[in-house]
Amino acid sequence: MSFWRKRIGTLRAGMVVAGILLLASLASYGQQTIRMSLADGFDFPVGKPNGAGYYIARGLRLTSPIHFGEDWNGRNGGDTDLGDPVYTVADGVVTWAYNVRAGWGNVVIIRHAYRDPATNQVKFIDSLYGHLLEMKVKPGQAVKRGALIGTIGSNSGMYPAHLHFEMRHNLKIGMHRESVARDLTNWASPSDFIKKHRQLNREWNQVAAPAGTYPVYQGFKGI
């Protein structure tokens, strides 16, 4: 009798675990929401707040050869910026913070809500910080503009040290950049966007931002 009780207990535990895994799987596809504050402005991700001491070695290019963001380097060249601080460009919530290896290394993605001055509508945008030496944040963490989120890296020596920085209007990209059209409806020119949104009105109310929008990532995902 005790044998069957143990078997039933084991089966129940297995069903609970399976249920949790199923819910987690569904959540990765679902269109949940997260509460977040509206950004009161955007700053540059290095040399805060104005990018002092850094330059853009390579910018956004949506035609061949494709480059989906900006590469920020320290003005002293080489690996002199290795380990330099990287900051979030605006208030937001971390949606991704993993080591995905390959050509990326450590990657942080943060979702931001802001009121568009041109339309007065609340909009959302993702910022991505790639090749980091260290990550200082975790998924689900709320961050304030200028908060330390990581340090400049080289993807374990694959590249000279630099920050790969992207901003995306399309919230469904995640780590699947080839899944959407190469145009400015999906991608933002990072520096242009920041310059146009340096100072926004402070609003104390929070908004519901889309969450769970990224396709499931099948590659390596470490912390």
Question: What would you call each of these model-derived segments?
Answer:
Residues 1-9:
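N-terminal secretory signal peptides that target proteins for export/translocation
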